[in-house]
Design a protein with these regions (language model features):
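Hinge/cleft segment of the Venus flytrap/periplasmic-binding protein
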Residues: 13, 43-44, 177, 181-185, ...
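Bacterial lipoprotein signal-peptidase II cleavage site
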Residues: 23-39
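Extracytoplasmic "Venus flytrap"
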Residues: 46-73, 79-94, 110-114, 178-188, ...
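Periplasmic-binding protein-like
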Residues: 48-51, 103-111, 130-134, 175-176, ...
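Short beta-strand elements at the ligand-binding edges of bilobed clamshell
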Residues: 80, 140-163, 176-180, 208, ...
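Hydrophobic alpha-helical segments within soluble ligand-binding/sensing domains
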Residues: 92, 148-174, 215-219, 269-273, ...
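Hydrophobic alpha-helical
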Residues: 109-125, 193, 211-275
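Flexible loop/hinge segments that line or gate small-molecule binding clefts
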Residues: 119-155, 166, 173, 269-278, ...
Length: 336
């Protein structure tokens, strides 16, 4: 799709050479939604997708939902550029610069880090390319991007805290398994949970540590915490399902019963977490809905046409607080 833009020479020869490899999959491999077919190319809206790439069940479901929404049949040529690793910001900055230099019509961005995006976003703005943030926010002025589409991390995490208060009316020793440091999602989930339990009597935070969204790290961190505290932990808030599932295994390995001796609450709502909830190994799962590709499609079209968008578009989700609720969610196909 052709739009009038100002053209900028944004990247030098060396950077462009490196990006040829980094974006090779955007139009050629099986992971890419877009291709460079000549037929009908001028009629398609070209969208660069600066993505995180493989990181876990939620991320896989979310990125696939975006790919499924931005198809050629829907009028798009999607250029998918996953980060070299889930924490590699440089590859994302390079991909973003390439998309601006290639004069795509819009950019979707899920940042591996919240900071460091000002210059990139300013270049996109100067080139009149709207940027839509998916899931994660950035530490930049909101006039540098069109909108952010995401479930409300603060509200989702607050639901965990509110459930915990009702489950432990006299308080508890608790531990928090956090995601990758520096991400907006981590900060927001801490904020929501802390807001919910702030001032409640009897709540003792034993500590918090990153487990990098990983089941293995969630297990190892929990093992260490239980040993260091003579198993005197009643509640674990895992900021994603994988870490919570790992924590449940550590609880069992310590000779304790998850759901009875130690309650574990998680955020995401993957099929694995719902199965663990149905089995009694998790006690609470807050869904962080990954399926908002269609919302992103509408936002891109509106941004390109010069329409106004809310700066934050909230994606709704659900909570599941019992084995029965977990099984019902599975039966309804709500896992991913």
């Amino acid at each position: 799709m052709t739009h009038t833009k100002r053209t900028f020479a944004l990247i030098g020869i060396a950077a462009a050479g490196a990006l040829t490899l980094g974006l090779a999959g955007c139009s050629g491999n099986s992971d890419a939604t877009g291709t460079d077919d000549a037929a009908g190319g001028d009629d398609l809206i070209t969208v660069g997708y600066v993505a995180v790439g493989p990181e876990g069940g939620w991320r896989d479901a979310h990125e696939q939902a975006v790919k499924d929404a931005f198809t050629k049949d829907a009028g798009f040529d999607l250029k998918y550029a996953p980060a070299a690793s889930p924490t590699d910001q440089k590859s994302q900055l390079d991909a973003f610069a390439t998309f601006v230099n290639d004069e795509v019509d819009a950019i979707l961005l899920t940042a591996t880090e919240a900071s460091g995006w000002d210059d990139s976003l300013k270049l996109a703005q100067e080139a009149e390319i709207p940027v839509i943030l998916l899931d994660r926010g950035v530490d930049s002025s909101d006039d540098l991007y069109a909108t952010r589409i995401a479930p409300d991390n603060v509200t989702v995490a607050k639901s965990v805290g509110e459930w915990a208060l009702t489950s432990f009316p006299e308080g508890a020793n608790y531990y928090v398994l956090e995601g990758v440091p520096g991400l907006s999602v981590v900060n927001e989930r801490n904020e929501g949970f802390d807001d919910a339990i702030s001032g409640a009597a009897g709540w003792n935070k034993v500590g918090a540590q990153t487990a990098n969204w990983s089941a293995d790290e969630g297990k190892s961190v929990t093992e260490t915490v239980l040993k260091a505290n003579n198993n005197d932990i009643q509640f674990i808030f895992a900021q994603n399902d994988e870490m919570g599932i790992g924590a449940a295994q550590a609880v069992k390995d310590a000779g304790l019963t998850p759901g009875t001796d130690v309650k574990i609450a998680t955020i995401d709502g993957t099929e694995g977490a719902l199965k663990a909830l149905a089995a009694g190994e998790l006690s609470f799962v807050a869904q962080y809905n990954p399926f908002f590709g269609d919302i992103a499609v509408d936002a891109v079209k509106k941004a390109i046409d010069g329409g106004s968008l809310e700066k934050v578009i909230i994606v709704d989700g659900e909570t599941f607080d019992s084995a029965e609720a977990g099984q019902a969610a599975l039966d309804a196909g709500k896992g991913f």
